[in-house]
Amino acid sequence: LDKPNRLQVKETTFNTYDYKLFGEIKGVDDYFDLIDALNYASPDDEFIIRIHSGGGSLGTADVIINAIQNTPARVHGYIESLCGSASTIIFLSCHTYSISPRAEFFVHTASSGTIGKEHENYASIMFDRKRVHKMIRDAYEGLLTEQEIDDVLKGQDYYFDAEELGERLEAYTEFQQKKFEAELEAFQKEQEDALDCGVKPKK
């Protein structure tokens, strides 16, 4: 008698993307290739974003971060050498991360300039201040202490070498995992409460 086939083979097709985020982060149109690849990726695809950048445009960083957070693919951030300012927020938005032995990581608040009438400048500055403060708190929560985040918002710069950054990333990963579990538990409870009340749960 023929023996049953115990081996099943599943053929899969996936892509691995290796992207170099080097130099100053400039206009968003310089990153359409990365953004489009993330937007059209499949769950089996993988991205490696290699970073050597002192930062740049927060607006462009925002668009890249949105693409990373919304892609079904897995995105790994790797610091080749320098990672500062806006590029640190991109790095921390990746799903996993690693660093080279010579990695440098620095954090500071945003800088900007405005041209126009005094009352227009004031309104613009206050709006940007509120937006940037929220971005900094969201990005570095778990990596920096609350006091360190407050210091950054007051103008303090922080610099970490590979050893200290590695230790902080371990704590940051644990913090993010606990945060995810708490949010998932709260969502599940909300769904259960909705069902108990006879209300259609959210999708």
Short names for language-model regions:
Residues 2, 18, 29-36, 44-45, ...:
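Acidic-enriched, low-complexity/disordered segments with a strong bias for Aspartate over Glutamate
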Residues 5-119:
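Cleft-lining beta-strand/loop regions that shape enzyme active-site pockets
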